Regions:
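Internal alpha/beta core interface subdomains
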Residues: 179-181
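Glycine/threonine-rich flexible loop motifs
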Residues: 136-138
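Conserved cofactor-binding/catalytic machinery of classical short-chain dehydrogenase/reductase
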Residues: 148
């Protein structure tokens, strides 16, 4: 079973003014002690995504485990450590056949029914959310809440990542409700190094 770090930052180019700002933020996160990052780009520009992914790998690959969102082909091309798929992406077992047994595979879920189904796959970890209301995604699913997270914890022994509206103020309660890790986007954008250090301190 994989061992997830408490903090699971997600880097999305849409949150930055340009790629250089994103790369600088990634290096700040690594300097703060972050050991895992997901690169998520929904633009559909595969060439740019691959260039960015390779640059992140070159800058961080020695110290940070890198997860590619959605794109199994880019995961392999950029030599990333794992792939994360959502409910509208490749099915978990199809993704597994592409990336092989050694790379990590994560699956997003948005309710306990989806989580129970994902738990039957070869996914190494599962994500559930949104735990709280979030502004990072336009087409959000209904809020799961801490109670939904507790139910999810009862349904799986796989490592569980909570996502959606998680801040330094509520992160500890999310861990106490059963999450192994918290995925964060927005609350790391302002001063990434300081924010990550504060998250890591809160998460313990």
């Amino acid at each position: 079973m994989v061992s997830l770090p408490r903090l699971y930052p997600i880097l999305d180019p849409a949150c930055f003014s340009d790629a250089a700002e994103m790369f600088a933020a990634a290096e700040d996160l690594a300097a703060a002690g972050v050991t895992l990052l997901q690169y998520r780009d929904k633009s559909g520009n595969a060439r740019r995504m691959l260039d960015n992914a390779r640059e992140l790998k070159q800058r961080l690959g020695a110290t940070v485990k890198l997860i590619m969102d959605d794109r199994a082909d880019l995961c392999l091309a950029a030599q990333y450590d794992g792939l994360h798929v959502g409910q509208d992406d490749l099915p978990a077992e199809s993704a597994r056949r592409i990336i092989g047994p050694a790379r990590w595979l994560g699956v997003s879920t948005h309710n306990t029914e989806q989580l129970a189904e994902a738990g039957k796959t070869s996914a190494d970890y599962l994500a559930i959310g949104p735990i709280f209301a979030t502004s990072s995604k336009a087409d959000t699913d209904p809020v799961v809440g801490l109670e939904g997270l507790r139910r999810a914890r009862e349904l799986t022994s796989k490592p569980l990542v909570a996502i959606g509206g998680i801040t330094r103020a509520n992160a500890r309660s999310v861990i106490e409700a059963g999450a192994d890790a918290v995925a964060v986007i927005s609350d790391l954008l302002r001063d990434p190094r300081k924010s990550a250090e504060e998250f890591l301190r809160v998460l313990g």
